[in-house]
Every structure is written in structure tokens, then in C-alpha cells.
Regions:
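Proline- and acidic/polar-enriched loop/turn elements at helix boundaries
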Residues: 10, 63, 85-86, 93, ...
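Hydrophobic residues in well-ordered beta-strands that form the structural core
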Residues: 59, 82, 88, 110-112
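Extracytoplasmic "Venus flytrap"/periplasmic binding protein-like
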Residues: 77-79, 132-133
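Predominantly a Rossmann-like dinucleotide-binding segment in NAD(P)-dependent oxidoreductases
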Residues: 106-111, 116-176
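Conserved PLP phosphate-binding loop immediately N-terminal to the Schiff-base lysine helix
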Residues: 89-91, 120
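N-terminal glycine-/serine-/threonine-rich beta1-alpha1-beta2 phosphate-ribose binding loop
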Residues: 1-78, 91-107
Length: 177
């Protein structure tokens, strides 16, 4: 449709370049990927510049930062898609709930990336179960097998803050573990 990717932001420039390359490889020579050099924002306040440049915001940052990025987006009347989890602690959860209420009052759309909830195979399976295709379910177990979570090795001269931000999955201040 009439959607164009116009800006990206990250605390680290190499992450923008790697992500942009992946998007371009996935979508090919798509004209709707229109991120000029001036719209590649780097730094701790980069999210503000990217949000200011857009109509709809996609928040895929480490979840420890997400409540504050969400707050900025809603306060600036932006529609938001954000990945799960939406926060990492009670303070962040309260912030997200508060901003979700404001978003609703402003009639802004907010969607959380619960990918399996929207995947057609899962939706079809749920319908079949609800319609009794396998009878009454008395119990069940679900497993999710994966190769594991990435680890970025510490680089020489890297600060503790940068190391933790690049390995956010393993640190409670920016993760959900």
C-alpha cells in the first residue's frame, strides 16, 4: 500500500546499517524503502528525531527503553506498532498502561507484536479447536525449540553500558529475562 520507510534510529550507527541492509535484501529494490542519510539517526535521543519524521512508528528497541519511546510517540500523536515485551519492570508497565489510555483517548492505533496471534496457521488451528475438530481438550503441552539467543562478544575498549545495550537480552535493566 501507500507505506514508505522514511527513518531509522539506534544508539549505534552499525546497527542502523546492518538493519537497513537486511530490510533491503528482504524486500529487494523496493522504492518504498527511502531512508536518506540525513534520516538515519544515531544516539540516545535518536528515537525522537525518527519519531518526529514519521506518521506511524515501529518500536523494536530493547524493551527497557520501550515505555519512554512509546510515551514520546503518543505525546506526539503517532500511531505505534511495538514489539513485545512492552516493558521490563513495574514502572515501565505503568507507563505503557498510562500511555495506552491516552492513545485510546486520542484515537491513535497501538498494536503489539504478538506474532503468533496474527499468523494464519495459528488462527486457523484455534478456530478448528474451538469448533471441536479434536474433541474436548483436557490438557496440553506446548514447546518452542530454538537454537538459542545471540551473544555479542565484548570488544576491546567497549564500555560496560555499550556492552549491556548490545547484549540487552541478558541484562534486566533493558530486557525481560
Amino acid at each position: 500500500p501507500d507505506v514508505e520507510l522514511v527513518a531509522m534510529a539506534d544508539a549505534f550507527s552499525d546497527r542502523i546499517e546492518k538493519s537497513l541492509k537486511g530490510i533491503q535484501e528482504h524486500f529487494g529494490d523496493e522504492k518504498k524503502i527511502n531512508i536518506k542519510e540525513k534520516n538515519r539517526f544515531v544516539g540516545f535521543d535518536a528515537y525522537k528525531k525518527a519519531i518526529d519524521s514519521a506518521d506511524v512508528v515501529i518500536l523494536t528497541t530493547p524493551p527497557g527503553f520501550r515505555p519512554y519511546h512509546f510515551e514520546y510517540a503518543i505525546n506526539n500523536d503517532k500511531h505505534v506498532f511495538m514489539e513485545k515485551p512492552v516493558a521490563t519492570d513495574p514502572v515501565g508497565v505503568r507507563k505503557v498502561l498510562e500511555m495506552a489510555k491516552i492513545a485510546k483517548e486520542k484515537k491513535l492505533n497501538v498494536v503489539v507484536g504478538l506474532q503468533r496471534h496474527y499468523q494464519s496457521k495459528y488462527i486457523d488451528l484455534k478456530k478448528r479447536i474451538d469448533n471441536g475438530a479434536i474433541g474436548k481438550i483436557r490438557s496440553g503441552q506446548v514447546y518452542w525449540n530454538d537454537a538459542g539467543v545471540w551473544v555479542k562478544k565484548r570488544k576491546a575498549g567497549q564500555s560496560e553500558l555499550e556492552y549491556q545495550m548490545r547484549n540487552w537480552y541478558y541484562f534486566n535493566s533493558v530486557s525481560y529475562t
